[in-house]
């Protein structure tokens, strides 16, 4: 799935997903031949975990460690 689809499913903005990738909190997914990010179930699960951890008050540094 593309970043927009992942954003809609998880409730996390596309810009935030890109930020998490740059910071190494979310692994960058493989790219399609057209150079689109190609997210799968593992990235969706990780992003959902990150969102819930943030809601519980975990710092970004702590989430990166988990």
Regions found by a protein language model. Name each.
Residues 2-9, 27-33, 38-66:
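Arg/Lys-rich, alpha-helical DNA-contact motif
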Residues 24:
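Glycine-centered, phosphate/nucleic-acid-interacting loop/turn motifs that mediate DNA/RNA or nucleotide
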